[in-house]
Each structure stands twice: as structure tokens, then as C-alpha cells.
């Protein structure tokens, strides 16, 4: 047995599961992305099994078959449920509450074995989850191929192009991110008047935007992907809340990495940006 295989998962009689071919599950984190994925799968004719820690799990009620709520991140139980329901593939979508990484009492023994030997950041945690899932014969699927229309293109995305000043600021911000991203932090930052005002750490982009708004009354937000992030489940994501927070903090331009950033609820994002006169720009992809 693989050292990360869930030993107490029930044995499934696959002979009686022909109707469950290509059954897909979603490990649903926070945010609207897992909802979008679940809706799309349901539209394609088969509602996914949804496993989530979310307190608002009922939002999946009509687009999950079945919906499994969990109070704590028990990966053993999640794998058992997927195997019990004949799941062959899983999609991991949504934000992971980063604070749980520092509360080991929440995890089951399977995850604790990993936590004791990996870096305590969300990317390492997600990679460990993927390793365990795949060792149990369940493949991890990319969600960007299910929702290709959400992938940010290059160039102007909103109602107006950036000003020369905004472009100088986001080009500078992108050059800074290229330096700090290999250090496993700083997926996003805010630049105002050629100076870095705030850099994202474990608090997340939204909190970083709020922090920047307390320091300056203007600026641009730049968001890019780390080279060690997995394109299947760890793409940077922006959505309506991003624009709302930018508006509250006085930021006037959003620059994201094209092809490696998702814009969730795109039409709403563009409408909010237009109302607040926020420019949105797709930076050239840093794909290797």
C-alpha cells in the first residue's frame, strides 16, 4: 500500500458503478469560483459531489449530488467519501483559509504526517493534499479548462486603457513581483507613485488592499502567479470583491497576469470597474 493511501476507505464494488463513469467531485474552498465550477458541471449534465468546510454550504444545495459538509479538514473522510461515490476525478477550487495551517489540531493524522515535514504555506499544503488524493487513485483536474472564458487575456480588459502613470506603476510592480515571487510570498502588491505601498503575505489580497488604502488614497494593484503554483488548482483569482475593495481603497488600476489569472463573474467585474473608473489590464504571461 502507498504510504499515503487511506487505509480505512471502504472497498467499492466497481462492477456496479458503470453509471458513475467519470464521476467528478469538487473540494470547495471559499469564494465564488467553486460555485461557478459546480454550476458548469451541472449544466453539462452531471452535478458533482461537493465536499466543503464552508459555513454557507447550502449555496451548493441545488448543484451538488451529494453535498457533504465537514467542520474540519479531515482528508481521510474526504477521500473515503469520494471513493464511496465512485469519484474518479476531483477539482480543487476556492480559497483555503490560510489561518488553519497554524492550527494542527484541526487536521487528521494523515495530514499531520505531511504538515510535520512541509513548509507551512498554503501552496505546500495544497500540494500535499494533491499527493494524498492522487495516491488513492483519484486524478486532480484543472478548472481553467472547464471555465476557459474566465482566463484573463492580454491587453485592455475594461472600459478604458491605463494612463501612462498607471502603466509605469504596474510595470514597476510586475518587475518587483518577478523578484519576490520565487521567495514564496507576494503574489500581489500595490504601487503608488512609483513606490511599493503594500505586499501580500498570508493575509490575502483583500486584506492587503485594505491595508494599502490606509496608507495611500490611490495606486494600482498588480497580481501575478508564482512559478511553483500548480495550474490545475492554484491560479490567482480576482472577482467583484477585488474591485469593490479597490474602490474603497482608492486604487484606480488592476493589472493581472494573462493566461494565468481567473476573473470570476467577469461581466460584474467589468461593470463595477466601469462604475469606479478602474482600468483592468492583462500583463504578458510569464509562462516558461
Language-model region placement:
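N-terminal basic/disordered segments at the start of proteins
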Residues: 9-53
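N-terminal glycine-rich phosphate/adenylate-binding segment common to multiple enzyme folds
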Residues: 78-146
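Conserved mixed alpha/beta catalytic, RNA-binding, or beta-rich assembly cores of soluble enzyme
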Residues: 41, 123, 139-244
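Short coil/turn connectors at secondary-structure junctions
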Residues: 19-23, 44-47, 85-88, 136-138, ...
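General beta-strand structural signal in soluble alpha/beta enzymes
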Residues: 26-28, 50-51, 90-93, 122, ...
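Short glycine-rich anion-binding loops that position phosphate/pyrophosphate groups of nucleotides
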Residues: 30, 95-98, 195, 226-227
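N-terminal positively charged helical leader segments and presequences
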Residues: 34-67, 88, 98, 109-116, ...
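Feature captures the catalytic cores and cofactor-binding loops of soluble hydro-lyases/lyases
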Residues: 53-85, 103-114, 207-288
